[in-house]
């Protein structure tokens, strides 16, 4: 196997290549900003649901869930209080009367 030639200092790319890469990158980066939507593919603003509407609907459902949970906890608490009162009342009455 033949020995590899010694490496020299790295060569800089030719100026034309740098200019071409610069123009290509500027074109690619600027393309999305200037791109026009294809005809017929744009959704009119009136038919697009907004983010605020989705957030409002989510908060409405969360509030309904919280109300149901609060009602359930309230009913359970009332049931437990009635049981405790009944036990306390029954403990006061003599067994023979």
From Swiss-Prot:
UniProtKB keywords: Cytoplasm, RNA-binding, Secreted, Signal
Protein family: Belongs to the NICOL family.
GO biological process terms held by the UniProt record: 3'-UTR-mediated mRNA stabilization; spermatogenesis
InterPro entries cross-referenced by the UniProt entry: NICOL
Organism: Bos taurus
Protein's job: mRNA-binding protein which interacts with a range of target mRNAs including SERPINE1, ACTA2, CCN2 and COL4A1 and may promote extracellular matrix production. Binds to the 3'-UTR of SERPINE1 mRNA and stabilizes the mRNA, possibly by competing for binding with SERBP1 and preventing SERBP1-mediated mRNA degradation. Also binds to the 3'-UTR of ACTA2. Testis-derived lumicrine factor that triggers epididymal differentiation and sperm maturation.
Gene Ontology cellular component terms for the protein in this record: extracellular space; perinuclear region of cytoplasm
UniProt-annotated location(s): Secreted; Cytoplasm, Perinuclear region
Name of protein: NELL2-interacting cell ontogeny regulator 1
Subunit and interaction comment: Interacts with NELL2; triggers epididymal differentiation. Interacts with cell surface receptor TFRC; the interaction mediates uptake of NICOL1 into fibroblasts.
Highest rank taxon of the organism: Eukaryota
Any GO molecular function: transferrin receptor binding
Signal peptide extent: 1-35
Keyword match Cytoplasm: yes
